[in-house]
A protein has these predicted regions:
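Polar, enzyme-active/binding microenvironments
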Residues: 4-22, 29-175, 180-197
Length: 197
């Protein structure tokens, strides 16, 4: 939006980034936005580039297709990782659990976290990137699980990768973003300014 008297007002533009928006800016706000405390990645080998290093794999899981994969039906096990930092917290702390399903042909995948009670956080059944902020209390053993059995009993067949866990706080914030070209034919809104309040 262009205002008179020479000033420029940014619209709250929620449109998808595209070629015709390159160079334009938008303003947005967010409530309880997860903000990394240090940015230190707590997961070991989240992209499975080092095979099963850092992970415990249940029967039926294997590293293939760029991630942890279940390729046959009726697999009712999990992959899991124990994070010492989470196990050693001295007060309730929030963490962002993130993973990507790059392929799925059946069932759904469930995320569980020891908070310290064994708690289901998500049950997802489509390709995509998923992230959840979970508050973990003292007494947790630091373990989280990706289960191949859905709550309905159907079993997951597919691939999960790019697993990440970060310590976060949740803040209200406002943002100024600019649309930028990030590849031959890809465009993204890139944050330029962030203000918490």
């Amino acid at each position: 939006n262009i205002e008179a008297a020479g000033s420029v007002k940014m619209g709250d533009d929620t449109d998808t980034a595209s070629a015709d928006k390159v160079g334009t800016m938008r303003y947005r706000t967010a409530t309880d936005e997860p903000v990394p405390v240090t940015g230190t990645e707590l997961i070991t080998n989240g992209d499975f580039s080092n095979g099963t290093t850092g992970w415990s794999f249940g029967a039926g899981w294997a590293v293939s297709n760029g991630g942890a994969t279940v390729s046959t039906a009726s697999v009712t096990t999990d992959i899991r990782q124990t994070i010492p930092y989470v196990a050693n917290i001295s007060a309730a702390t929030k963490f962002r659990y993130r993973f990507e399903i790059t392929d799925i042909t059946a069932g759904s995948l469930r995320l569980f976290v020891n908070k310290p009670t064994f708690t289901q956080i998500a049950n997802v059944s489509a390709v995509g990137v998923y992230e959840y902020v979970v508050e973990v209390s003292t007494g947790s053993n630091g373990t989280f699980y990706l289960y191949s059995t859905s709550s309905s009993g159907s079993t997951f067949q597919g691939t999960v990768t790019n697993v990440s866990v970060l310590e976060v706080t949740e803040e209200d914030a406002s943002y100024a973003d600019m649309c930028m070209q990030t590849g031959a034919s890809t465009y993204e809104w890139v944050n330029i300014v962030r203000n918490t309040y």
